A protein has these predicted regions:
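A surface-exposed partner-binding patch
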Residues: 3-181, 296, 326, 339-346, ...
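Charge-rich, solvent-exposed alpha-helical interaction surfaces
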Residues: 23-26, 30, 272, 287, ...
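A short, ordered amphipathic alpha-helix with a cationic face
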Residues: 49-55, 240-244, 259
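Long, contiguous interaction/recruitment modules in multidomain scaffold/adaptor proteins
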Residues: 136-252
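Alpha-helical segment of the N-proximal tetratricopeptide repeat
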Residues: 242-246, 251-278
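Amphipathic alpha-helical scaffolding segments comprising HEAT/armadillo-like alpha-solenoid repeats
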Residues: 247-257, 279-292, 311-323, 342-353, ...
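Conserved hydrophobic register position within alpha-solenoid helical repeats
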Residues: 266-270, 299-302, 329-333, 360-364, ...
Length: 476
């Protein structure tokens, strides 16, 4: 008889609490549905695990793990690893799960540690869902202030140093069982100790503040993942950040947002809606517009959410907001409606002289470049701005012009800049410009800088090469 890949062997009910049986059965069915829904492996990380299932883990293996590390695994996680799987499958490093998949049971336990998992897995977990940034920094900074000393295991010279670093890791990441990798320095882990035991937390090895998943246990978190694969929510051009935001339907979240006065809950609801797959249904956009008209403290964020799905519906609200908050409006247009940059060129030209915010100026120049083929004359005055960051952006923008060589006098002025960061941007902007009038100024720069301050010399070197010179030759 052929074994169905997605037909796990369910252990007798007496081996785990009966409350999990129905949910495990749903998960069993949804694994097959998820694989079918994502047959082209479009969900981020799915091409790595391919919805593979390892054989279920035996009770003896679970007990041996708990004894080795001195921990008690959450009941629902125990039920999962002992139930969900393909008894005839090969055991691989990962199996079906969020991002790059779930680690095979009992593996990668040191992912958040230098070593010493026998000590650290049973250590008290110091993390909490409501931890502030200040609390996180107070916990993590003192323990990793010398983290560069431990980047390479071969650099650890003494047993004392190893033990100290293990202790530091244990204080920050103690009580966490790594479940899988999200790529780069991000992981999801199962809390084993403390008041939040059983919860899933997203952690970052570069010490960004941890983010707890909203589900209160492993099975709910895993089933939510399968639901989002099946619904297509995770099949998206955008990075979906599963497990970081509330997963209920957008309609449910907006309804809760309307009927609660708790600010954190309101923020969580809108963040959840923001990360839904686009475009949102027209009825949801109607509700968002209604909320915008209430002019509450979330108005700007609601306009952003609307902008993601419908530029035409968002446009009147963007027009109302642009004079007061050009930075936000220019960002929204650039991020969500680049095809409509030309609509905003007159507004940008009108507001640009009064913009002092550096980020707002950056986004204004993006809209100009995209929406106006003759943006250069608008940008020229800002090469003399008192703010060096504004000057940098002005030269960078001018460097994107197809008519750069018509503005050689402006670039020559820039090559005499006192601010090295601005100067570097001017040099970069002259890529492939080989006019001999530039050479005397390039030589002056070569003599002026003995060291590669802000990569001046690194960028100057290929410019001099246009004229057959090296840095040393230019200094003569």
């Amino acid at each position: 008889m052929e074994i169905d890949f997605f037909m796990p062997n369910i252990l007798p009910p007496k081996t785990f609490p009966s409350m999990y049986q129905e949910q495990l059965h749903r998960i069993q069915q949804k694994l097959a549905q998820a694989k079918a829904a994502d047959k082209d492996l479009e969900v981020f990380g799915a091409s790595s695990h391919k919805y593979h299932l390892n054989p279920p883990v035996s009770e003896a293996e679970v007990l041996a793990f708990e004894e080795k590390y001195g921990v008690s695994l959450p009941d629902d996680y125990r039920a999962f690893v002992q139930t969900i799987g393909d008894a005839n499958a090969q055991k691989l490093d990962t199996m079906a799960g969020p991002y790059y998949g779930l680690y095979a049971f009992g593996t990668q336990v040191n992912d958040l540690l230098y070593k010493g998992s026998e000590t650290c897995l049973k250590a008290p977990c110091a993390l909490s869902p409501d931890m502030t940034q200040e609390e996180w920094e107070a916990l993590s900074d003192p323990h990793f202030e010398d983290e560069d000393d431990f980047e390479d295991e071969e650099e650890v010279e003494t047993t004392e140093t190893e033990e100290e670093y293990t202790r530091q890791c244990g204080k920050v990441f103690g009580g966490l069982l790594p479940l899988g990798s999200q790529g780069c320095a991000d992981y999801h882990a199962l809390v084993l100790t403390g008041p939040y035991a059983g919860r899933i937390v997203n952690v970052n090895w570069d010490l960004l503040k941890p983010v707890f998943a909203f589900e209160t246990n492993f099975l709910d978190w895993y089933e939510h993942y399968l639901d989002e694969v099946i619904s297509g929510q995770l099949i998206d051009d955008r990075f979906t950040w599963f497990g970081y935001y509330r997963g209920e339907a957008a309609e449910v979240l907006l309804n809760e947002y309307e009927h609660t006065t708790d600010r954190k809950t309101q923020t969580d609801c809108l963040e959840g809606v923001y990360h839904k797959k686009l475009p949102l249904e027209p009825a949801l956009l109607d509700k968002i517009e209604k909320l915008i008209t209430l002019n509450n403290e979330d108005r700007d964020f609601l306009i952003e959410i609307l902008s993601q799905s419908s530029y035409e519906r968002a446009k009147p609200y963007l027009q109302d907001l642009v004079t007061e908050k050009p930075n936000k409006v220019f960002r929204y247009i650039w991020w969500y409606a680049q095809d409509h940059c030309a609509d905003w060129v007159p507004v940008v030209k009108e507001l640009l002289p009064s913009i002092t915010d550096e980020e707002a100026f950056d986004f204004a120049t993006y809209l100009l470049r995209e929406g106006d083929d003759n943006f250069e004359e608008v940008i020229l005055p800002f090469t003399d701005d008192a703010n060096p960051q504004i000057r940098r952006t002005a030269y960078y923008t001018l460097g994107k012009s197809k008519k750069r060589e018509q503005y050689l006098d402006t670039f020559i002025k820039g090559l005499q800049e006192s601010d090295s960061k601005v100067l570097n941007k001017v040099i970069q902007a002259l890529y492939k410009v080989k006019d001999k009038r530039l050479l005397p100024y390039y030589k002056q720069i070569a003599k002026r800088f003995s060291k590669d301050e802000n990569y001046i010399l690194s960028n100057l070197e290929p410019r001099l090469a246009y004229f057959g010179l090296t840095i040393e030759e230019a200094r003569k």
